[in-house]
C-alpha cells in the first residue's frame, strides 16, 4: 500500500516577472520527491493593495490546510516586502538573503531596482536571443538547411528524442543558434550521415533515448503505428548510437535528464559560452 503524498502550497511572489523565484523554487523543491507541491505564481505585486491581497491569500491557505505554505519572494520594494513577510507562511527572501551579504562584502548599497535582471527589452542580449529563437524555429527537424554554417550547434538523433525542445531551450536561455536534424532509417541503410550535415561534423551533438521511452512518446503521437513499435524504436536507437560512435559525435541519453541538464551538457561538450 502506497502512502498518500504530502501536499504543500508554494507561493512564488515577485514585483516583476517572478522568473527568478520560480526557477530557484523549482530547483530547491525538486529535492523533495515525497511532497506534492502546488505552486501559485503571483508576479507583478508592485503595490501595497496587491500585497495585502497576497497576504490574505497566504493566510487563508494556512488556515484551511492547517500548515503554513512556503513563500518564495524576490520582492524588492521594502514596504511591500515587509508586508508580505508578515503573512502566515514560511517566508524565503531570495534577494535579501544574498544581497545583504554582497552589500557587506562590497561596502556598497544595492540599487533595489525591480526586475533589473530582466530589463533587457532593448539590449543586445535580448536581440541575440530573439535571433537565436528565430534561427532554431527555422532550422527545426532539418526543414531549412541553407544557413547551417551559422549554427552554433546541430543536434542530431532519431525522431522524438528531444531535439526540438532542447534547441529552443538553448536559444531562449542562452542565445545559442541551435539547429536540429533527424537521423532516419534511410540514413542507417546508407550507413552514413545525411549529406546535408556531413560538412558540419564539428558542430554536431547527438541525443539518444531508451527505446522503451521512445515507444511511449511515439505512441502518443501515432498510436499503434510501425513508427511507434518497440522493435522499430530499438532498431533506430541502436543504429543512431552506432552511427554517432562511428562518426566520433559526442552524445547523451535524454531519458532521465531534465531539459536544463541536457542543455547544460550540450554547452559544456560543445564548448559554448553561456550568455
Curated annotation (Swiss-Prot):
Keyword tags: Kinase, Nucleotide-binding, Serine/threonine-protein kinase, Transferase
Top-rank EC class of the record's enzyme: transferase
Pfam families assigned to the protein according to its UniProt record, in alphabetical order: Kinase-PPPase
InterPro entries, A to Z: Kinase-pyrophosphorylase (IPR005177), PSRP (IPR026530)
EC number: 2.7.11.33, 2.7.4.28
Binding annotation for ADP: 157-164
Keyword Transferase recorded: yes
UniProt keyword Chloroplast present: no
Protein family: Belongs to the pyruvate, phosphate/water dikinase regulatory protein family. PSRP subfamily.
Name by which UniProt lists this protein: Putative phosphoenolpyruvate synthase regulatory protein
Species of origin: Bordetella parapertussis (strain 12822 / ATCC BAA-587 / NCTC 13253)
Amino acid at each position: 500500500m502506497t502512502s498518500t503524498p504530502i501536499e504543500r502550497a508554494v507561493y512564488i511572489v515577485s514585483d516583476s516577472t517572478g522568473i527568478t523565484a520560480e526557477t530557484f523554487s523549482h530547483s530547491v523543491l525538486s529535492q523533495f520527491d515525497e511532497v506534492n507541491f502546488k505552486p501559485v505564481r503571483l508576479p507583478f505585486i508592485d503595490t501595497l493593495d496587491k500585497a495585502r491581497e497576497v497576504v490574505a491569500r497566504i493566510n487563508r491557505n494556512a488556515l484551511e490546510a492547517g500548515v503554513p505554505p512556503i513563500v518564495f519572494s524576490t520582492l524588492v520594494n521594502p514596504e511591500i516586502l515587509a508586508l508580505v513577510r508578515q503573512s502566515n507562511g514560511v517566508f524565503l527572501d531570495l534577494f535579501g538573503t544574498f544581497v545583504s551579504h554582497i552589500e557587506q562584502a562590497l561596502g556598497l548599497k544595492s540599487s533595489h531596482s525591480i526586475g533589473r535582471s530582466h530589463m533587457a527589452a532593448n539590449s543586445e542580449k535580448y536581440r541575440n536571443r530573439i535571433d537565436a529563437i528565430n534561427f532554431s524555429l527555422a532550422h527545426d527537424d532539418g526543414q531549412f538547411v541553407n544557413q547551417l554554417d551559422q549554427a552554433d550547434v546541430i543536434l542530431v538523433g532519431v525522431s522524438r528524442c528531444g531535439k526540438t525542445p532542447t534547441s529552443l531551450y538553448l536559444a531562449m536561455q542562452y542565445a545559442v543558434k541551435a539547429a536540429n536534424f533527424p537521423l532516419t532509417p534511410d540514413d542507417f541503410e546508407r550507413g552514413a550521415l545525411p549529406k546535408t550535415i556531413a560538412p558540419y561534423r564539428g558542430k554536431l551533438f547527438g541525443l539518444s533515448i531508451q527505446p522503451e521511452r521512445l515507444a511511449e512518446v511515439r505512441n502518443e503521437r501515432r498510436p499503434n503505428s510501425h513508427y511507434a513499435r518497440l522493435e522499430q524504436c530499438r532498431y533506430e536507437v541502436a543504429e543512431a548510437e552506432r552511427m554517432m560512435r562511428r562518426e566520433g559525435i559526442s552524445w547523451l541519453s535524454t531519458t532521465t535528464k531534465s531539459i536544463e541538464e541536457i542543455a547544460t551538457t550540450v554547452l559544456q561538450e560543445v564548448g559554448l559560452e553561456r550568455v
